[in-house]
Every structure is written in C-alpha cells, then in structure tokens.
Amino acid sequence: MAKEDSIEMQGTIIDTLPNTMFRVELENGHIVTAHISGKMRKNYIRILTGDKVTVQLTPYDLSKGRIVFRAR
C-alpha cells in the first residue's frame, strides 16, 4: 500500500485488544480496529484508552487501519 493510496483520519482509542490491537472511534463516528505501525512499535510508543491518534485506512477495507501517530 503506497502512502498516497491511504486515507488518514483522526480518532480516539475506545478499547484495547490483545496483540497491540485497538478499537478506534473516528471523528465521523465509525469504529475501526487498528494496530500500531512498525515505527511506533520499535520506539515503544505507549497508547492508552482515550488517546487521540491518527489512523491510516486503506480504500479496500475501511474496517481495519494502522495507527501512525499519537497526539500529546
């Protein structure tokens, strides 16, 4: 998936799932399942319930995404 093919949206973590998966509520009200990107995992970025995050979605499956940024 090329970077320009993905859709980036803002959301809030509402639930933590096993294996570094999270349930994220997007700004438009949709709920998606997202995992942490490799660079965030490598740098040990901790994500907790209630954090504001940026999620990349692929146009092929809008129910799954990748967390690429955690807002402070």
Swiss-Prot record:
Q: Which Pfam families match?
A: eIF-1a
What is an example of a GO molecular function annotated in this UniProt entry?
ribosome binding
Q: Which GO terms describe its cellular component?
A: cytosol
Q: Which domain of life is it from?
A: Bacteria
- Give the CDD domains listed for this entry: S1_IF1
Q: Which residue ranges does the record assign to the S1-like domain? A: 1-72
Matching entries from PROSITE patterns are given as: S1_IF1_TYPE
For this protein, the record's HAMAP family field holds: IF_1
Task: Tell me the protein's name.
Answer: Translation initiation factor IF-1
Q: Which organism is it from?
A: Psychromonas ingrahamii (strain DSM 17664 / CCUG 51855 / 37)
The record's gene field reads infA
